Amino acid sequence: MADAAMSGEEKEEDGGKRTTAATPAETLGFYEPSDGSRVETKKRSLSDLSLLRFISAELTRGYFLENNEAKYKERREKVYTCLRIPRELEKLMVFGFFLCLDAFLYVFTLLPLRVLLALIRFLTLPCCGLSDGRVLQPAQVCDVLKGVILVICYFIMHYVDYSMMYHLIRGQSVIKLYIIYNMLEVADRLFSSFGQDILDALYWTATEPKERKRAHLGVIPHFFMAVLYVILHAILILVQATTLNVAFNSHNKSLLTIMMSNNFVEIKGSVFKKFEKNNLFQMSNSDIKERFTNYVLLLIVCLRNMEQFSWNPDHLWVLFPDVCMVIASEIAVDVVKHAFITKFNDITADVYSEYRASLAFELVSSRQKNACTDYSDSVSRRMGFIPLPLAVLLIRVVTSSVKVQGILAYSCVVLFYFGLITLKVLNSIVLLGKSCQYIKDANMEEKLFQPPTCQPGKTPKKAQNKSKPNQGHPPDETANTSVTSQPTKAASTAQLLVESNSDKLLTTPDAEEKDISGDNSELKQKQADKDLLDIDRFTICGNRID
């Protein structure tokens, strides 16, 4: 029995050894291997760390992009957005350029005719009498003031010696001229921001109702301030044009290169800042104004250079490469700047269509029968483009560069004037057609017939607090008159601060306004008013002049 038990134990030990030996092959190493297998595995791992095997692993290593599909789709959309930015931006720039051109041509074409009609009305007043108790309509008073300012500033500009200014600037060093040009750009923006306020103050002071108690300096002081502003701004632009002319005529073109490199510094100052849609709209309007002003400066430089070379057409081809280089650098800087701003702030390229629709809405609204402000003043407030100083300078340069002698020359001047009128009319018609198309594409037709939110003699915040009992009504139901309807006499005797409907389109959607109620609607309205201050460059309101 003992032998049998011993033999059973030996069998069990043999079986255990057999199972233990077979376990590593069957269980793939779930049990601890023996010492021999450890040594063999270590030798195999050391042999796996060879350089060739590492290179082979790097060359054959795979990965699966579909595991992070959402991230890669987002990156692809950003690339597509950057590719769409140049096209959408240039559409906005072209539309804005023709808006500025329309306001600029108005000074040369329709403004003299409107002043002439106002003078005819004034001279025929004893025969016709006063139909509505006024000598001139408010719009006619503003036109006469613009015409008088234009004529006075033109004659004062004759005392500015362009040749002396050119040689004075040419004698300076390159670095000093670069600093001067940068200072002139900053001063131009400051003048533009304050100049329209001076002109608006003059227009309202001259047309304010007589029965109201006047708390201002009077028309004459405001008029002299406006003349002084236009003169200083015109001289500032003349110095800019002279500096650019010196850069064009320099032998090594180093100054022109430095001035163009200044545009690329603008990328550094704006790309890495946080931008909202409203801030980007403000910057886009500033870029439109800057590009149009640069084109007029280039025109002035070409006129002065062609006069110095006795209008030799061969010299025009000498200037052509430099002009193209300046324009190309300006376009490249704008494209790169807007592309990276939209990329870093997650703004789609469709936002430029909204900007274009907003400008179109302002254009169509300002063409209404009873608009709150003149169209050229609306462009000035929106883009910071004031055409009067630039028009004074261009007239001064053209009259000094082109000599008109003889009947044939005067006939050419008359034909040229009629050509400008034709261009102005065609440009206005095309702009109105395009604007209506943009408004239709943006589904904004019904907003053209909504009245502006106005309160006489109140700021927007005070007017909002006064209208708190009517918060239960939707915004669309508070409308009781049309934009094209005739205003009442009581409303015409007060200064109305008008909130632009196009600004509201970029801040508060209609669907959200109809759903919210009570305190939420008040909070939304306050937020919209805060955003409007960011959208408009100088003021969110147009003063109604009646």
From Swiss-Prot:
Comp. bias intervals (Polar residues): 478-505
Keyword presence, Transmembrane helix: yes
Alphabetized Pfam families for the sequence: DUF747
Regions of compositional bias (Basic and acidic residues) in chain numbering: 514-529
Disulfide bonds: none
Coiled coil: none
Sequence intervals crossing the membrane: 92-112, 149-169, 219-239, 316-336, 384-404, 413-433
Membrane topology (UniProt): Multi-pass membrane protein
Any one of the GO BP annotations: positive regulation of bone development
GO CC, any one term: endoplasmic reticulum membrane
Region (Disordered): 1-37, 449-529
Function according to Swiss-Prot or TrEMBL: Plays a role in primary cilia formation. Involved in cartilage and bone development. May play a role in the differentiation of cranial neural crest cells. May act as a downstream effector of hoxc8 during development.
Family under the similarity heading: Belongs to the TAPT1 family.
Name listed for the protein in its UniProt record: Transmembrane anterior posterior transformation protein 1 homolog
Recorded name of the encoding gene: tapt1
